[in-house]
């Protein structure tokens, strides 16, 4: 437990240092930030014209819930149409830069969707769609990840993983959790096939 605490603290400190810190400046970027999926998503968000400031966008904190991260579409109460999301990384539930990168990729898919489509987070259908996309594109349902969870040998395993993890993500939304499975099934085919900003599932 003590090792886990110090490892989590170390990972988080690498995200909360000032911008002048070499960890946040090339060529010494933290491994989680240099992960290809994270880099591609950050670039895609920028290409859409949405500003990114990692010093304020990424918040590493102790979450005290069974989650690795979260996404806040507008954390400063800005006017409609303004883009100022917050990506939360839960320091108490991550054990290495691989998982930090995976969590960042998941939450950055939400940030991309917010920039591209102005997600209505009150709509269970919009919420389900972005969770399906995040689980599909972040790498959390890759074969090796499912193998480590003991889930393998099933047909369409990737799709089953995406359904399962999207439903888990929707459980934190009081307005949608009772309808999560139903809503996911209604939008699954369309949202699973929407792999933007990638040409296909990476």
What are these regions (language model features)?
Residues 86-89, 94-99, 104:
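Acidic, Ser/Pro-rich intrinsically disordered regulatory regions that embed short linear motifs
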Residues 1, 12-68, 82:
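Glycine-rich short-loop/terminal segments
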Residues 36, 93, 120:
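Residue-level detector of functional hotspots within protein domains
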């Amino acid at each position: 437990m003590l090792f886990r605490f110090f490892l989590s603290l170390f990972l988080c400190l690498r995200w909360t240092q000032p911008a002048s810190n070499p960890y946040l400046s090339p060529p010494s970027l933290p491994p989680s930030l240099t992960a290809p999926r994270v880099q591609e998503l950050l670039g895609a968000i920028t290409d859409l014209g949405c500003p990114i400031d990692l010093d304020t966008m990424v918040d590493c904190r102790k979450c005290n819930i069974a989650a690795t991260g979260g996404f806040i579409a507008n954390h400063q109460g800005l006017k409609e149409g303004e883009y100022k999301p917050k990506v939360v990384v839960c320091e108490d539930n991550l054990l290495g830069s691989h998982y930090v990168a995976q969590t960042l990729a998941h939450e950055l898919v939400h940030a991309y969707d917010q920039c591209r489509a102005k997600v209505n987070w009150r709509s269970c259908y919009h919420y389900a769609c972005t969770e399906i996309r995040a689980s599909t594109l972040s790498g959390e349902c890759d074969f090796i990840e499912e193998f480590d969870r003991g889930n393998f040998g099933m047909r369409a395993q990737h799709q089953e993983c995406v359904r399962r993890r999207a439903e888990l993500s929707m459980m934190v939304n009081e307005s949608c959790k009772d309808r999560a499975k139903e809503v996911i099934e209604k939008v699954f085919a369309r949202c699973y096939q929407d792999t933007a900003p990638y040409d296909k599932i990476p």
